[in-house]
């Protein structure tokens, strides 16, 4: 059976928090941009030694608020206080000097420098040449204290994603950080690395460091946080503690309505193999082999999910299957037809639909209208084209129907696709791809960066395709998503599929070991 987070770590003692001077006070923060009220009278406090989760959908105002704290923006109204005093923060340098650190979702490290050099970068006294004397020893002390295993002499480009995150934390601690903001810190980690990170954060909290934990993973919030603040439309809509709430209540606070977090998965009779991948080998962008002897079958009426940390060959596998990347060996077949190496249009004609990982780069033409994007791959065929002329009435009827059925929020059909929200762009892509009722659907990172409401809708549509008899292959770095959707789960590491298991056999622990490259549990 699927299992949740393994351990709920001991919380730091916050019984005297009300008697403390808050480490951080955001008092009545308001920030306006042209046409947008990004923050509206926001109040937030963080105590010393507290892990404070900040939740909210895209556009809720979280990033603006944290950028104000870090000195990237100035508030139009309100005040930032540290230890009861006005912070005086006007730049990131001021924030660092004041003991505020921020670890962005995309790490801010120089790959060609060593760990010690990255830690020393920007420190007072460093000129053109970095002085790393004494840095390695201090890095070793911090690593030992907080369970952050890093080699000071290793080059950053040699490190795995989880190790790079540890470097970012060490870098903040080296600068005597007393308040650390972490933006989606578990997005690129294996379950084992998530548990290790939680231990580190709890140790930091024990030492009095305040932590602001920004994430969309509600289970992690309940497992880790001492307090939770929820934002929506630039305002704080609620503050609570894990013992007094649930995933459903938090999601409701985020979107303003009840949300179905676990999609219904009706029983479906599984049919014949519709997508067959056999012995596939594919080179990556740098010429090295990214996909190594991959084999996988997806049958009618099932969803197979591929789990794995980013950069382990998932993108190259998807692009090879749909015809966007050359194959060096192996075979791809759709309904028994060999489509290996075919042009994407021929693969599509064989019955495959594709929801790409990079929706803005590969899924839509941002400057084209909603209608133009909806007929992008079929504009030269009936009923949209006759004798070389577009049939505008047929196009409009078709597009209106898709926009309505797939709940795409757009002012008009003529609105440029790039003007839509991420969730609506993803719905637009789904509408186009599913309108042909494909036999095989490959969806890569289907809900990355979309709101809870859009993710709920996308999950429902994928399950409906399964019910229709399509073979659905979902590639996702979100393990919760893979577990919620899949009938079978494949785990990919270093270009190989290490194991394929039924959902009833899947545990977070087993998948986590496989994601980390352990074949012993395969």
Task: Please name every model-derived segment.
Residues 16-522:
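Glycine-rich phosphate-binding loops of nucleotide-dependent enzymes
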